[in-house]
Amino acid sequence: MPRARKGNTPRKGGQRRGGGARSSAQADSGSSEDEAASEARSTTSECPSLLSTTAEDSLGGDTVDEQGPQEDLEEKLKEYVDGLTDKSAKTRQGALESLRLALASRLLPDFLLERRFTLADALEKCLKKGKGEEQALAAAVLGLLCVQLGPGPKGEELFHSLQPLLLSVLSDSTASPAARLHCASALGLGCYVAAADVQDLVSCLACLEGVFSRSCGTGSSTSHVAPASLHGVCCAALQAWALLLTICPSAHISHILDRQLPRLPQLLSSESVNLRIAAGETIALLFELARDLEEDFVYEDMEALCSTLRTLATDSNKYRAKADRRRQRSTFRAVLHYVEGGECEEETVRFGLEVLYVDSWARHRVYTSFKEALGSGLHHHLQNNELLRDIFGLGPVLVLDATALKACKISRFEKHLYNAAAFKARTKARSRVRDKRADIL
């Protein structure tokens, strides 16, 4: 796997801290503004999400009981794998969905290694002969398989065998938007985790760039308005492309900057709030990569870009949904802050007894990609998946017995005191910038 520029100088504001894990006796609490900003930094697609179902949903209404015997779990997983080759499209979709939920919420490397050829053949048929939702689910399962198998020879072999199909569906303008969207995401995630060599990376980058350039008109001199049905495809291709930029060799980065940095601002005027946000975050990432290559990097059209970013950061149009306005303003304030001043806001992610710091745009793109793929299972994978712990610099998996866990756990009363103190400090900080009626009078 062409892992992300590890031999280079650490990224400013990004990997110098590595994301390291540390014990935390504090409760996972924070201000509502921080939560809103964190929510705003996570862009979702406009097609129906495959992560909308809870992790308890399963084939035939059964549940994957995390506390149940391992034998029962494997029996259910075998049923799901067998269901992938059923004659009924509805049964195949149910099996794919159940398998996807299991892969997102559990670590199953041994089970998957034994059946990787069976799974590869079944997913190939689903991508070739399936339609719409079935292709979308198959692509999502493939991405999760790469996360489970990791960057070794087995994962590389799986991705390399199905990469041409992902490229084919993604480039097919007659395929359903949902299928193309999830093929784009799977292509980005699979290539990030299991690309065999740099040539695979370059070919995936070229395909993804071609999709969002053709769909949204960023590669043409004339303005081109993409239909609403393609906004999700465009957004997913752009985000997958940005993910792969974080592991792209410096020699290729400079050419990409020259080609795409002047074009991407066109997407800031899109009708889709998700596409605008994805474009803004990608622009910030390109600035970060450019400043890594050249410390005194100067963008020629800086004034016009900052003006557009400032407008989006203060947008108050009433015809937009309130949640969309809040998400857009929060994101573009952070983008503008980085483009103008070079400082990236830090996001703190607590899981179990550990803490992950997301303090660069490259790190944010990687974290968001895994978050969208794994959904509610992200924290489980951060704690136990060696691949994710290596990517985010979390070190070996923590092994804690029941006594250690009990010693680290704080009581409900202590948690209440901590939250009360945080609330009081937050109120004082906010009161300084609020209008006072007495001052106005």
UniProtKB/Swiss-Prot annotation:
GO terms for molecular function: ribosome binding; translation repressor activity. The keyword Glycosyltransferase does not apply. One of its GO terms (biological process) is negative regulation of translation. Gene3D superfamilies: Leucine-rich Repeat Variant (1.25.10.10). Pfam families: IFRD, IFRD_C. Ribosome-binding protein that acts as an inhibitor of mRNA translation by promoting ribosome inactivation. Associates with the P- and E-sites of the ribosome and inserts a C-terminal helix into the mRNA exit channel to preclude translation. This is Interferon-related developmental regulator 2. It comes from Oryctolagus cuniculus. The gene is IFRD2.
